[in-house]
A protein has these predicted regions:
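Conserved pre-motif I regulatory segment
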Residues: 1-36
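Conserved nucleic-acid-binding Ia/Ib motif block in the N-terminal RecA-like helicase ATPase lobe
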Residues: 2-5, 59-126, 134-137, 242-257, ...
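Walker A/P-loop NTP-binding motif
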Residues: 20-29, 44-59, 80-84
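Post-DEXD/H (motif II) to motif III coupling segment of the RecA-like Helicase ATP-binding lobe
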Residues: 130-196, 341-342
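A short beta-strand element within the Helicase C-terminal
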Residues: 134, 289-304, 326-330
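Conserved interdomain hinge at the start of the Helicase C-terminal
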Residues: 201-246
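Conserved segment of the helicase C-terminal RecA-like domain
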Residues: 280, 307-311, 315-348
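Non-catalytic terminal extensions of ATP-dependent helicases
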Residues: 351-439
Length: 439
């Protein structure tokens, strides 16, 4: 499939310099390739475009294994592959759901490309659920994270399973890790697009909190943002829950995101935030890596990042591509901005408005209890909502169709009407659940 046609499908006008360089190097050279480029520069597409060209679409064999450090990146990368419209079959494998369910799905899909976490991939290969003999391309995305303590042994076991590898592609947003010998990348081409200077498109501010508990200051700060898309970063799961509860009680549309949530809860939180149903995502540093959500205007460091690397990945969520962004440090007495934060830092004083109300997002998220396995498509959902709930097409936003359920963004002001009109109705002859996702 031509690159221009894929870009049209993705709504991208042209590749950036890093993506063009990666595409040409991976396709035209036999060497292994290491791509170093900041967060938010499109590394997923940088390797998927050439991979799609190198895979034999006429063969049912598994030919490409993409290793990622977490389930969110596995799911998002597989979604990009699907949206490219290359016709290649792909699947994401990750922990948090039964291996047997994935095994059944693998037999149905017969993927040519698999995205997965190291432990789950090892499990499938060890049980013979996937064949290693025809795998010719190994991709390790965020290889610095994959090779950290706890992943290293699993990675070494995994890499040793592929006897016929022709190419290794490693990608990272940092240059902190040496590539271990077991990866066996002997003749490698390194594309280094890391920039030492801080991103000039991110403006950095400090916000003084008079109280040690910063929640009141956070409220005033978020009120000043109106309905701008914002991620608030904290260092601990219980702090995320407490902060999200406070903001919800104060009328903000909030999603909470951390590793203590189950997979479906995490998916719902991300869908609400990415489709515009929640203006604020309150997250641990789990949300600083691998999430590809465009148009995030503000990053708020409620807690100071524990490491420079965490800081780099946090601010990488904003100012993506050619857009601008803002980062805010909320500081109580005795707290200081770390020395590694470079660039001009301005004071920001949000207006005190105790009676002000948060802006409400235009959209809300609707949950549908059926999905791909029930032959439900985006077109079916749009047609059903326009006919049964009397919505206009402009009232319907992003639709995400999963195997067994769907998320649909609809006009928030019409959500009650939708729930009333769809109650007891069948879609494609199937009775199902329709309900609003509120967190």
């Amino acid at each position: 499939m031509e690159v221009n046609k894929i870009l049209d499908k993705l709504g991208i006008e042209a590749l950036n310099a890093m993506q063009q360089d990666a595409y040409e190097t991976i396709v035209r050279h036999n060497n292994d390739v290491v791509v170093l480029s900041p967060t938010g520069t499109g590394k997923t597409l940088a390797y998927l475009l050439p991979v799609a060209e190198l895979v034999d679409g006429t063969s049912d064999d598994l030919q490409v294994v993409v290793v990622v450090p977490g389930r969110e990146l596995a799911l998002q990368s597989q979604t990009v592959m699907t949206n490219m419209g290359s016709g290649l079959r792909s699947m994401a494998c990750y922990g948090g759901r039964p291996t047997m369910d994935e095994h059944r799905q693998l037999r149905q899909v017969c993927p040519q490309v698999v995205f997965g976490t190291p432990g789950r991939l090892n499990d499938h290969f060890d049980k013979g659920n996937l064949d290693t003999s025809k795998v010719k391309i190994l991709v390790i995305d965020e290889f610095d994270k994959c090779l950290e303590m706890g992943f290293r042994n699993e990675m070494e076991q995994l890499v040793a399973k592929f006897p016929n590898l022709k190419k290794r592609i490693l990608l990272s947003a940092t240059n902190a890790e040496e590539i271990p010998h077991f990866v066996n990348a002997k003749t490698k081409e390194t594309l280094d697009y890391l920039v030492e200077e801080p991103c000039e498109r991110i403006n950095i501010y400090k916000v003084e909190s008079k109280e040690k508990d910063k929640l009141g200051t956070l409220r005033q700060l978020l009120l000043s943002f109106k309905d701008e898309s914002t991620i608030v970063f904290l260092n601990y799961r219980d702090s995320v829950e407490r902060t999200a509860a406070f903001l919800t009680e104060n009328g903000f549309s909030v999603s909470a995101f951390h590793g203590g949530l189950d997979q479906k809860e995490r998916e719902a939180a991300l869908y609400r935030f990415s489709n515009g149903s929640a203006c604020v995502l309150v997250s641990t540093d789990l949300g600083s890596r691998g999430l590809d959500i465009p148009n995030i205007a503000n990053i708020v460091h409620y807690h100071i990042p524990e490491t420079q690397e965490n800081y780099t990945h946090r601010i990488g969520r904003t100012a993506r591509w050619d857009k601008e962004g803002r980062a805010f440090f909320i500081l109580s007495q005795g707290e200081y901005i770390p020395e590694y934060v470079e660039g001009e830092i301005e004071d920001y004083v949000p207006e005190e408005a105790p009676d002000a109300k948060p802006s409400k997002p235009r959209m809300a998220t609707l949950y549908l209890g059926k999905g791909k396995k029930d032959k439900i498509s985006k077109g079916d959902i749009v047609g059903f909502l326009c006919k049964k709930a009397e919505l206009d097409k402009d009232d319907i936003g992003r639709i995400d169709v999963k195997d067994y359920y769907c998320y649909v963004a609809v006009n928030r002001l019409k959500m009650m009407k939708v729930l009333q009109k769809t109650k007891g109705e069948k879609i494609k002859g199937i009775r199902t659940i329709w309900e609003e996702v509120k967190k």
